[in-house]
Amino acid sequence: MERRGSSCLCRCLALLALLPTLSLAQYESWRHYPEYFQEPAPEYHRPEVPSDVAKIQLRLAGQKRKHSEGRVEVYYDGQWGTVCDDDFTIHAAHVVCRELGYVEAKSWTASSSYGKGEGPIWLDNVYCTGSEATLAACSSNGWGVTDCKHTEDVGVVCSEKRIPGFKFDNSLINSIENMNIQVEDIRIRAILSAFRKRTPVTEGYVEVKEGKTWKQICDKHWTAKNSRVVCGMFGFPGEKTYNTKVYKMFAARKKQRYWPYSMDCTGTEAHISSCKLGPQVSLDPVKNVTCENGLPAVVSCVPGQVFSPDGPSRFRKAYKPEQPLVRLRGGANVGEGRVEVLKNGEWGTVCDDKWDLVSASVVCRELGFGSAKEAITGSRLGQGIGPIHLNEIECTGNEKSIIDCKFNAESQGCNHEEDAAVRCNIPAMGFQKKLRLNGGRNPYEGRVEVLVERNGSLVWGMVCGENWGIVEAMVVCRQLGLGFASNAFQETWYWHGNINANKVVMSGVKCSGTELSLAHCRHDGEDVACPEGGVRYGAGVACSETAPDLVLNAEIVQQSTYLEDRPMFMLQCAMEENCLSASAAQTNPTTGYRRLLRFSSQIHNNGQSDFRPKNGRHAWIWHDCHRHYHSMEVFTHYDLLNLNGTKVAEGHKASFCLEDTECEGDIQKSYECANFGEQGITMGCWDMYRHDIDCQWVDITDVPPGDYLFQVVINPNYEVAESDYTNNIMKCRTRYDGHRIWMYNCHIGGSFSEETEKKFEHFSGLINNQVSKR
């Protein structure tokens, strides 16, 4: 056996989530599901509220991480109050979410998880069947009858999907001061031809949807702060001035339809639904509203560098720091990932205590994206490594960088299970409409079909499957908003795609993995060459919302390294598996020996799904010497390099058996090599290749004394998808004097700033590893 089992009168805010979904042409967060391209759903007719039921308004308040969640607050009898969590159920949560215009509730939370509210606790012991038109129709102890405290305030998490055609009840709107924005949808409509032709749309009228009608907003009370919020929602970090004269000319040509109200934002809101309702343009919203001495409100947004239609963006210097101080890691899509901050030359994570939309939006804008769509907690985008630099971050929303916010530098009580992440709003680039999956068993898989221009016409066709790999598949899944790639298929004869797309129109695709679109990858252009040809060899993908993330424990490598002079007669299995250098063939089998650089490697899965071998069990290889199956021919590379990067020796470990050696906390082991067991590494577990197992070495018999780099690369050929490939390389400085070896400064690539990386060759913390004679 080779292995060792390795969260009074209150007249503020008022409710409603505004823009959970935007039209497909304006916003690119839609899943590429077939149902999104079917006929529009019929208009929703809200159930009648019985005449004897009190009229109320609801809102979601508190420390929110998404605009569609928060503490449930009820406006009744001239006051805002809360709801107690006693006897609250998912049925009551459904009623709340539907009253707010969402399709359903995803969950509900107890014990003031969004912070304690103020004012009366209006409802206690609420019982709903789930079919009620309003929370006021559910049974309860009665208005204000409760024995609860605000530590028991209930919250809900609503689905972001809106009820089609939902109309808000504005009957109480004039009786509530500081009411929040209440509209079904919002958009930026390009007016000038120059902007209509651009992608993304960066300038135009701000329009809101009421029923089936899009209406303009009067600019009489419009401010730059309003523009900042709107631009942020559409994926832009900032706003700028525009030519008012040309818009006056356009407004004079056509009669406008104005929304009866105005907006009042502070500029720090992540979502327009958090802005307050501004002064009314007309006291009688029923009549045709005019904008006296005014024009339709216009926004002109500044895109980040990645999304600029004219090359490098000209946005303010604040968005272009000379050295990035924050980065995102482990996200499937552009503008999302675990937040990592550079401090004292080392990258570290952010603890999710007090992490909310305001702080997350500061990160997003700093990186050239819009406001935050979601502040993610609980290491849902994978665990980081290294220090936790920031804790209990509290931003006002006006900061240029996350490091300008108030925070606690102490990370006591935090661990990497609490790493904070963000999902930012990004501009609609239209990439999703140029790619589709067909023939799969579910919307996450299928044959890849691309839209290309041929002879002046747009046609759909296949992608040649030759040399198609997981990196190319990752770009496809990202472009479609379907997460990570779990598989890349070079043959898709078993999937029946669109019969009108059976011709190969793209070949020679080679991606780096960072592209926003498959069209951005290198390919043959119109000179399509697919040797195998035919429908059989069209490229395909399977996508997944989660992925594993393997990271090597650098400290264990450094601590376990030593030299061993091992006799040739003890290396018969190693010879069979080609684990020795070529010169071993000339070594005397009885008296000769090989000098081996031995070490242990502990490989952790810090991702959000299990790491499974690329090949199925039918393709595993039996190794008689080790008496078990190996599931991956190439899992890691072990290399000794000159300081100029030239390889002088390499590990020749032929293949690997993957299993769970140990796991964190109460996580159960799922994989083992023995008895033809399933192989892989469970999330939260690690696989330990001990220094004393066969082939766990680099044969340095022919290496002269000197200074070297020792490098370990996990999953070097990208055979299995991971959420982050940047942490797959570990490097150590190595000094070998012919008898002893020193291994020091072992670290994972990308853990330090570029400046610090350049200094890591300085001799410090040396470990003296003597030669071990056997």
From Swiss-Prot:
It catalyses: L-lysyl-[protein] + O2 + H2O = (S)-2-amino-6-oxohexanoyl-[protein] + H2O2 + NH4(+). It is found in: Secreted, Extracellular space, Extracellular matrix, Basement membrane; Nucleus; Chromosome; Endoplasmic reticulum. Coiled coil: none annotated. Disulfide bonds join 84-148, 97-158, 128-138, 218-291, 231-301, 265-275, 351-414, 364-424, 395-405, 464-530, 477-543, 511-521, 573-625, 579-695, 657-673, 663-685, 732-746. One of its GO terms (cellular component) is extracellular space. The gene is LOXL2. Specifically inhibited by a mouse monoclonal antibody AB0023, inhibition occurs in a non-competitive manner. Residues 1-25 form the signal peptide. Component of some chromatin repressor complex. Interacts with SNAI1. Interacts with TAF10. Interacts with HSPA5. Interacts with EFEMP2. Contains 1 lysine tyrosylquinone. The lysine tyrosylquinone cross-link (LTQ) is generated by condensation of the epsilon-amino group of a lysine with a topaquinone produced by oxidation of tyrosine. N-glycosylated. N-glycosylation on Asn-455 and Asn-644 may be essential for proper folding and secretion; may be composed of a fucosylated carbohydrates attached to a trimannose N-linked glycan core. GO terms for biological process: collagen fibril organization; endothelial cell migration; endothelial cell proliferation; epithelial to mesenchymal transition; heterochromatin organization; negative regulation of DNA-templated transcription; negative regulation of stem cell population maintenance; negative regulation of transcription by RNA polymerase II. It comes from the Eukaryota. Pfam families: Lysyl_oxidase, SRCR. This is Lysyl oxidase homolog 2. The lineage of its organism: Eukaryota, Metazoa, Chordata, Craniata, Vertebrata. Transmembrane segments: none annotated. Glycans are attached at residues 288, 455, 644. Its EC number is 1.4.3.13. Ca(2+) binds at residues 549-550, 722, 724, 727-728. Residues 58-159, 188-302, 326-425, 435-544 form the SRCR domain. It comes from Bos taurus. The fourth SRCR domain plays an important role in optimizing the catalytic activity of the lysyl-oxidase like (LOX) catalytic domain. Its cofactor is Cu cation; lysine tyrosylquinone residue.
